[in-house]
């Protein structure tokens, strides 16, 4: 039931407790002000007397280590104080990572690569945010890698991305997503093309581990890696692959003892596997809600948000000018492959896509690769377009794009399974 709190109310939080709230109603707005004491939102400190605004979809917890008084006004669907939080365990994990970082600093070695794993909706992205915030607050500059192609915390879903974290996440907007390294995958689950997923993860790990060496501070700070919530069968194999690719020093397992035991058995003994509880505040999302939040991220990519609106452009591209490809050809038995090639290689093959009405609403990734002879899988991407119309008579498509100009002459576009219905009037 929704709680109308338009007059506002003060909440007094004891040490080690948190105020949790959710906003589900459209156009609802909640204002939060820290009046006294110290408080943080997923690791970012609140500034006293500053008003923070949250809108629909917000599911947050304001935690305090010392105790505080917060003023909250607006319409919320859920709002309560909880004294049961795993924050002390989380800060202990941060302290352990700091030990690794100090060690790395002294020996001029790479800092820890840490994988955050667990089933869906256990707070993996939130734990990444907390650990990254704590790291920057003590002067570190870690990398944040997001391998969760189902949601896309850095880029949009269907891609694997890494950013350098230089300052704490904004309370309202999360981490600044400037200059990310993004590799195209094109599916919303690794099962869409397992071979390609592992290849993209390997490439991302190789490039980012190397990039650590370019800056002394980042080198000792290490990488925090967010992973997919698919932890059974092939999903588990993908986690093991990621742990190897990133040369993980530690794996933090949220909530699932079975996964923890499997990892203890399967990773080398020098990798620290730690089981952590999930927070009771983490909100479970239905399939529909996951779909919605994926769409919301894509919408934000094109249209921004209420605080920073963007105004995308639409332009026509003739079929003949559309250099559209897809990664992964249909499987063939090994016996039908050219000599020296395996059926697996087909899964990483770049194949041309013919324009048909089936392209409608699909997201197309604009690659920095100039031709299919380049390493398309391992080339950063420039951005995304969305097909808003396919006109078979005019032999053209309309593309929605953040860029005003038509596509660069040699633009290479990659087909993605992701779709976005542009009904932003
Ligand atoms: P996925 O399986 O999609 O990758 P996840 O395991 O990464 O999910 P999160 O995205 O971290 O889970 O958390 C799910 C939702 O719960 C988010 O909207 C987050 O803001 C919210 N959440 C996390 N921790 C808390 C908390 N302590 N109190 C209230 N809400 C929370």
From Swiss-Prot:
GO terms for biological process: mRNA 3'-end processing; tRNA splicing, via endonucleolytic cleavage and ligation. ATP binds at residues 18, 59, 121-126. GO terms for cellular component: mRNA cleavage factor complex; tRNA-intron endonuclease complex. Keywords: ATP-binding, mRNA processing, Nucleotide-binding, Nucleus. Coiled coil: none annotated. One of its GO terms (molecular function) is ATP binding. Pfam families: Clp1, CLP1_N, CLP1_P. It is found in: Nucleus. SUPFAM superfamilies: P-loop containing nucleoside triphosphate hydrolases (SSF52540). CDD domains: SIMIBI. Belongs to the Clp1 family. Clp1 subfamily. PANTHER family: CLEAVAGE/POLYADENYLATION FACTOR IA SUBUNIT CLP1P, POLYRIBONUCLEOTIDE 5'-HYDROXYL-KINASE CLP1. Required for endonucleolytic cleavage during polyadenylation-dependent pre-mRNA 3'-end formation. This is Protein CLP1 homolog. It comes from Drosophila grimshawi (Hawaiian fruit fly). The lineage of its organism: Eukaryota, Metazoa, Ecdysozoa, Arthropoda, Hexapoda. The gene is cbc.
């Amino acid at each position: 039931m929704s709680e109308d709190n338009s007059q506002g109310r003060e909440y007094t939080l004891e040490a080690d407790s948190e105020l949790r709230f959710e906003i589900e109603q459209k156009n609802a707005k909640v204002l939060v002000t820290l009046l006294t004491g110290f408080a943080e939102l997923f690791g970012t400190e609140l500034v006293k007397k500053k008003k923070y605004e949250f809108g629909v979809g917000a599911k947050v917890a304001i935690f305090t280590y010392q105790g505080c008084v917060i003023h909250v006004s607006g319409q919320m669907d859920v709002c309560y104080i909880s004294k049961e939080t795993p924050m002390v365990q989380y800060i202990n994990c941060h302290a352990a990572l700091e030990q690794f970082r100090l060690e790395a600093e002294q020996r001029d070695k790479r800092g820890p690569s840490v994988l955050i794993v667990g089933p869906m909706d256990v707070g993996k992205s939130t734990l990444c945010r907390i650990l990254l915030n704590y790291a920057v607050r003590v002067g570190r500059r870690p990398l944040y890698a997001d391998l969760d192609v189902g949601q896309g915390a850095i880029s949009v879903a269907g891609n694997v991305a890494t950013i350098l974290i230089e300052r704490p996440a904004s309370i309202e907007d999360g981490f600044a997503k400037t200059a990310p390294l993004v590799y195209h995958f094109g599916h919303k689950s690794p099962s869409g093309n397992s071979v390609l997923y592992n290849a993209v993860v390997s490439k991302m790990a190789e490039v980012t581990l190397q990039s650590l060496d370019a800056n002394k501070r980042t080198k000792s700070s290490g990488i925090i890696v967010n992973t997919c919530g698919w932890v059974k069968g092939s999903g588990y194999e993908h986690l093991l692959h990621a742990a190897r690719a990133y040369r993980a020093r530690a794996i933090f397992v949220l909530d699932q003892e079975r996964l923890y035991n499997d990892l203890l058995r399967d990773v080398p003994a020098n990798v620290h596997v730690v089981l952590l509880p999930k927070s009771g505040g983490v909100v479970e999302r239905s399939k529909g809600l996951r779909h919605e939040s994926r769409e919301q991220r894509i919408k934000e990519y094109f249209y921004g948000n209420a605080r920073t609106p963007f105004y995308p452009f639409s332009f026509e591209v003739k079929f003949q000018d559309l250099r559209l490809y897809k990664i992964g050809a249909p499987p063939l038995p090994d016996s039908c492959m050219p000599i020296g090639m395996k059926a697996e290689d087909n899964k990483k093959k770049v194949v041309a896509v013919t324009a048909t009405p089936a392209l409608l609403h699909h997201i197309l990734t604009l690659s920095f690769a100039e031709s299919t002879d380049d390493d398309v899988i391992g080339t950063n991407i420039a951005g995304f377009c969305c097909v808003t119309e396919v006109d078979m008579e005019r032999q053209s498509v309309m593309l929605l794009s953040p860029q005003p100009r038509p596509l660069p002459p040699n633009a290479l576009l990659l087909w993605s399974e992701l779709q976005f219905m542009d009904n932003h009037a």
